[in-house]
From Swiss-Prot:
The protein's role, per its UniProt record: Functions in complex with FlhC as a master transcriptional regulator that regulates transcription of several flagellar and non-flagellar operons by binding to their promoter region. Activates expression of class 2 flagellar genes, including fliA, which is a flagellum-specific sigma factor that turns on the class 3 genes. Also regulates genes whose products function in a variety of physiological pathways.
Oligomeric form and interacting partners: Homodimer; disulfide-linked. Forms a heterohexamer composed of two FlhC and four FlhD subunits. Each FlhC binds a FlhD dimer, forming a heterotrimer, and a hexamer assembles by dimerization of two heterotrimers.
Protein name: Flagellar transcriptional regulator FlhD
GO cellular component: cytoplasm
Keyword Protein transport: no
Gene3D superfamilies associated with the record: Flagellar transcriptional activator FlhD
Pfam families given in the database record: FlhD
Compartment list: Cytoplasm
Family listed: Belongs to the FlhD family.
Residue ranges the record marks as coiled coil: none
Keywords: Activator, Bacterial flagellum biogenesis, Cytoplasm, Disulfide bond, DNA-binding, Transcription, Transcription regulation
Length: 105
């Protein structure tokens, strides 16, 4: 895959992520903050971005979303077969809730 293709795919992922994040924040800010792992400050900014601003942000050559499963226990929980899918989801939510939110610091 060529470098220009990779950059285009990164931009597409960025735009899809920003559009989803903004929709989540506008529908239910508290739930969005939990699901996205962002602070109220970032959620407020996401909610107010115009379409032009979203497109400009998405044009970055850096991936804007962060892989949150950097904890071995959490990743193992999500990847191993569990007897109860509901319990697995609850356990994952508890582990994710322990992680600090992203802020503008």
């Amino acid at each position: 895959m060529e470098s220009s293709e990779v950059l285009q795919e990164i931009r597409e992922v960025n735009l899809a992520y920003l559009l989803l994040a903004q929709r989540l924040v506008r529908e239910n800010q508290v739930e969005a903050m939990f699901r996205l792992g962002v602070s109220k400050e970032i959620a407020d900014i996401l909610a107010k971005l115009t379409s032009a601003q979203l497109v400009k942000l998405a044009a970055s050559n850096m991936v804007l979303c962060r892989f949150r499963f950097d904890d071995h226990a959490l990743l193992s929980t999500l990847t191993h077969t569990a007897k109860s899918h509901d319990m697995q989801q609850i356990h994952a939510a508890i582990l994710l809730a322990r992680q600090p939110v992203e802020s503008l610091n």
